[in-house]
């Protein structure tokens, strides 16, 4: 999936900016990352308020092999696979994207800013 396809997919949601990240893309709205594309698969930001929708669809989280991890250990991120039907349903994708953006905003508020040592 390329950057043009990502912008096209989210047209009903509004303007997005795909940025290259590793072997995929981070998808941003007004500077906030709310989705990622890895291995041609779309993942949306999830939190405790939106997780049930992903679970009801039988979707799972984005995982990756942690650098230097032993025993095949994988890291789990708070981005969950979007249901495949959303690729062909722009209005429904827009609704899921709004929820993902809201989850990203809630997550950003919880992350404390590092304190500076003097």
Residue ranges and their predicted role:
Residues 1-118:
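Charge-dense, helix-prone N-terminal extensions
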């Amino acid at each position: 999936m390329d950057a043009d396809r990502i912008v096209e997919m989210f047209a009903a949601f509004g303007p997005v900016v795909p940025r290259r990240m590793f072997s995929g893309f981070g998808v941003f709205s007004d500077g906030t990352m709310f989705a990622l594309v890895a291995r041609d698969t779309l993942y949306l930001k999830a939190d405790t308020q939106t997780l049930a929708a992903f679970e009801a669809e039988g979707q799972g989280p984005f995982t990756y092999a942690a650098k230097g991890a032993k025993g095949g250990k994988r890291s789990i991120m708070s981005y969950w696979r979007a249901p495949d039907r959303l690729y062909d349903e722009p209005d429904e994708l827009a609704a899921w994207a709004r929820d993902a953006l809201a989850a990203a905003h809630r997550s950003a508020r919880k992350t404390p800013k590092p304190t500076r040592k003097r």
